A protein has these predicted regions:
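Ser/Thr/Asn(+Pro)-rich, low-complexity disordered segments
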Residues: 1-241
Length: 241
């Protein structure tokens, strides 16, 4: 919210839909009808402002990140050097597939880009899944928040297999499951917590995935889109601890 709106109110000061309907903010008495109407008008104006800012953000141009030679999106752009980064997102099992999906839909990159994304498979427990770079829940499941999913497709089966492997690995390590990119218990010289990708061995190319063990609760929240019952149980386990 702070990214979209200057001077955003504290999260606990944002009224719920029920409170808006009653015409009162948290912890305050109901207001007269005229004030409720004025508040509703102000809320609609704020929503309109957010809509316009979202449209401006959605209009961003990504074409300069597309590498025609390999049919992939660069991981970034070096402003100082005025050139694309030579590395590219080259795996379908990546959070970057959401950008690929949207850019193809917008016509910013050709459809062949989708088929240039790597589809190497890995197996565990009799199930096959796409292999990702770091074996994190984020890579498999973040796009599911927006992208459509269809039963028994490669992506659908891969997401389910990835969650199953995460659950299995949690049992092996005797901890709640859910490993992904996250902050962890290390700080820099400014006492800022560090952030990097963590994952599960067997799901990712990256070496040393079993060296660290960091559980990210949001990984279970992402899994609600795939295995809601198991994810709810795991979230409750995390809350109890």
């Amino acid at each position: 919210l702070e990214f979209l709106l200057r001077d955003a109110p504290p999260f606990d000061a944002i009224p719920t839909l029920a409170e808006l309907a009653a015409g009162c903010a948290p912890g305050t008495p109901a207001r007269p009808s005229a004030l409720r109407h004025a508040g509703a008008a102000a809320r609609i104006a704020l929503i309109d402002e957010l809509v316009e800012r979202c449209r401006d953000l959605a209009a961003m141009d990504f074409e300069f990140l597309y590498d025609n030679a390999c049919g992939l999106l660069s991981i970034g752009y070096d402003v100082g050097e005025r050139r694309r980064d030579p590395s590219c997102y080259d795996l379908l099992a990546s959070e970057a597939r959401l950008a690929s999906f949207l850019l193809i839909a917008q016509g910013q990159v050709p459809q062949k880009h989708w088929f240039a994304l790597g589809r190497l498979l890995t197996g565990h427990g009799g199930a096959l899944s796409l292999i990702s770079w770091s074996g994190s829940m984020f890579e498999y499941l973040m796009p599911c928040l927006i992208m459509p999913s269809y039963d028994n497709t490669l992506l659908d089966l891969s997401c389910k297999a990835a969650v199953s492997r995460q659950i299995e690995y949690g049992r092996q390590r005797v901890v709640p499951w859910g490993i992904s990119e996250s902050s962890y218990n290390a700080t820099d010289m400014h006492q800022v917590y560090q952030y990097r990708a963590f994952g599960v061995p067997g799901l990712g190319f990256k070496r040393g995935l079993g060296d660290d063990l960091v559980i990210a609760p949001y990984a279970s929240a992402l899994a609600l889109t795939v295995m809601p019952r198991e994810a709810c149980r795991n979230l409750q386990t995390l809350a109890d601890k």
